[in-house]
């Protein structure tokens, strides 16, 4: 009897093993390339290239990714209200009045911004909303007027008065209560240097958690790669030519001097050609140097390649406001970060490579 049981057990185990081998050897479905474009988040164009087993899977993934982007866009908005949403605009409206209870996605973004303030010596300062708001208003006025002759600039006195309300220490975060309070009633937050990049990073991580294994997500100047292509090759990123927006550098003699190959990396670019207005024939762009309160004048563009889109977004802005030597020192202190700056006179030569 014992021998019979042993033989039956062995046969059963063999059957189970055979079944598991058959299941394990089942070929993977071939992944197909799909693309989609969104126009309704972060005031820019979002394009996604992804490889999925079916169009149904792709559509499900993209619907979730799109909804995530919309949510982050609404949370980080400083200009618009949304039904049932407490956002950065709400925080600004309550400056000097009362703490505002906020979503965890705001708290974590603000914490990153404070860390980057320390890391960059204040070159990233989301508390500069009062100064950036002045530049925004002048740029908006210029965009509404077809004649450049009527465009004007803020005065130094106007900017310096606003700069008295940019102390990052007046940003009070209570993580336990999940509240944010601006103790200076004249202070306001502007998260343009961190919000989009951080949102892209979080959205891509969420997509990976849902099973997306191969994708390239582009949100304006923020590019984030998820995994590799199905054949194991890396994604290739491009950098917009600051002097010809229709041209994108991707070849071996481009910005980085070699193909910008990406796998689970972020490629972010900031430039003086993205948002600007013209006064007396001179461009005044949107990246404001905290030291001068005027548009930074070191470069035409800065590109950063690193594993985190939120950090890359912050670093492009910070490096844009630093002289070359200072920027090199910062980049060399960071693991896994590559950066390059470029100007009209020295295109692609003032690199900050590690």
Located regions from the model:
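Mature catalytic core of soluble alpha/beta enzymes
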Residues: 2-12, 16-346, 351
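Cytosolic catalytic cores of cyclic-nucleotide second-messenger enzymes
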Residues: 354
